[in-house]
Amino acid sequence: VDAEKMSITINPPASPPCYAGEFADQYGAARPLDIICLGRAAVDFYGDQIGSRLEDMSSFAKYLGGSSCNIAYGCARLGLKSAMLTRVGDEHMGRFVREELQRAGVDTSHVITDKERLTGLVILGIKDQQTFPLIFYRRDCADMAVSTEDFDADFIASARALLITGTHFSTENTYRTSMQAIEYAKAAGTKVVVDIDYRPVLWGLTSLGDGETRFISSSGVSAHLQTVLPHCDLIAGTEEEIHIAGGSTDTISALRKVRELTGATIVLKLGPLGCTVLHAEIPKRMDDLIVHQGVRVDVLNVLGAGDAFMAGFLRGWLRDEDDQTCTAYANASGALVVSRHGCAPAIPSEEE
C-alpha cells in the first residue's frame, strides 16, 4: 500500500433499506449479539526468554492474536455476546484461532476458512519495559481477504455494535469490506466502533521488519481514516493514534479535527495515566481533560494492553454504564494484561 497515494472512493452509507430496519425492529433491544468484531486474526509467538533480543530467543509460547480477535475474546471473557468476522487459513494455525475463540464463547460462524491464504503470524519479544520487538508475517494473509461476500445485512443487524480495527481500512479490499459492514450497521441501528490500532508497517510506511514502530506521520493515512470517522459512534486510540486520525502531532489539535468530523464519543488512552472520555466539545488544554486514573502494576508486557482496555470499556458501554464504570473496567483490564506474558489469554474474566 502506498498510503500517500491512496485513493479509494466508497459511496457513503445509504438510507436504511427496509429489510435491515425490519430486522432491527424484530430483535429490538434483545439482539442475539452484543458486538461483532471485524479485523485481524493471527497467532502470536511470544519469546520465553524475557530480556533477550529476538535473535537470541530459543523457545516461544503460542497465543491467539490480532487486535480484533483479542477484543472479541476479551468481550466474551467479560460477559458479552461477541462474534468474530474474519478469515483464517485452511491449516493448523487457522484451526487454532477458531478453536481458541470458541473456547472463550465467541461466535465463529463468520470466521471463514480461506483455502488460498495462510493465517497471519506475529513473532514478539520482551526485551525490557520500553522495548518490545515484533515482526508481522501478514503479506496476503487470510484476514486481509475478508470480503463483502462473507456476511450479509442480517448478520450485522443481529448485533448491537460493530467494531472494526484500523488495519482493515488500509487496503482497497478491506476498506470496501469494512465500509459495507458500516453501511449495514447504520441502516440497522447497530453502533459503529473504531479502534484506530495504528501500525505504520501495516500501512506500508516502514520496512517489513520494523513492526515495533508505533507512529509515522502520513497525510495520506490521516485523510483516508478521516473518511471513516463521520460514520462512528465510538472512537478509541492512544495519543499517537489520535494524532494520525486528526492529522496533527498536537493532541488537542488532532482531537478538534476528529470532533469536526464526528459527534462520536472519543476515548483517549493515556497509558499508565489512565484515559479520558470526550462526548462533546474538546477543551483548550490537555490539563483541562478529566482523566480517569489507571491502575498501578509492575509492567511486563505492554503489547495487547489496548485490546484488553477496549474489551473492558465495551463491557460497560454496551450496558449503558457511566464513564466512571466503563473506564474502571477498561483500565483494570489493561493493567492486568501488561503484568502478564501474552495478550488474549491474559485478558481477565469479569470475576477477576
Regions found by a protein language model. Give the residues of each.
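Glycine-rich phosphate/adenosyl-contacting loop at the front of the ribokinase-like
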Residues: 2-107, 130, 146, 298-300
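A short, aliphatic-rich alpha-helical micro-motif
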Residues: 30, 155-157, 228-229
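Conserved beta-alpha-beta core of the PfkB/ribokinase-like small-molecule kinase fold
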Residues: 161, 167-257, 264, 273-275, ...
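Short glycine/proline- and charge-enriched loop/turn segments
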Residues: 51-58, 208-212, 290-293
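Short, conserved phosphate/pyrophosphate- and ester-handling motifs at nucleotide-, phospho-/glycolipid
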Residues: 75, 238, 306
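Conserved N-terminal subdomain of the carbohydrate kinase-like
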Residues: 81-166
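Conserved phosphate-binding/catalytic region of the ribokinase-like
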Residues: 2-36, 183-187, 247-352
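Hydrophobic beta-strand scaffold residues
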Residues: 82, 108, 192-194, 266
